[in-house]
Amino acid sequence: RQRQMCIRDRCLTASGEIKTLKKENMQLGYRSSVFKNGGLIIISLTLALKKGDKTEIKTEMDGLLNRRKQKQPLEYPSAGSTFKRPEGYFAGALIEKNGLKGSAVGGAQVSEKHAGFVINRGGATAADVKALIGKIQKKVFENDGVMLEPEVIFKGRNGD
């Protein structure tokens, strides 16, 4: 849906230049775009929205929020979904199948609510999160032959 709604955006380049991109130049795909690795920061966005019934829209929004609250560990800080969905599998199901739900490194923990999320249960460092991701990848690959690809991107001193 989002790909169809976005018309253009203004973004900031690494050199400080403001640039306008049209939808066709954003390379929008499944959990990917020029913004993910391109050094661009979105500063404004133009969307094409359809008019709709306010009550229906509110009902749909409330339903989506309730489903997220039930399935995702929104009560803890996290970077969202930790791994991309491997073709033919669900990352969370593979992680759970391998007995990793609830496992932790330092303050980073595989969520008990949804194994596809690494949460910060208090004091987690980037090193904790990276170590836990590595532990998950190793065990899932050893047991299932599936290499989970992180969706999380590390930036900064410890980002490598």
Region locations from a protein language model:
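Phosphate/pyrophosphate- and phosphate-bearing ligand-binding catalytic cores of soluble enzymes
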Residues: T13-G134, K138-K139, N143-D160
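Short, small-residue-biased leader/transition segments that mark boundaries at the very start
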Residues: Q2-I7
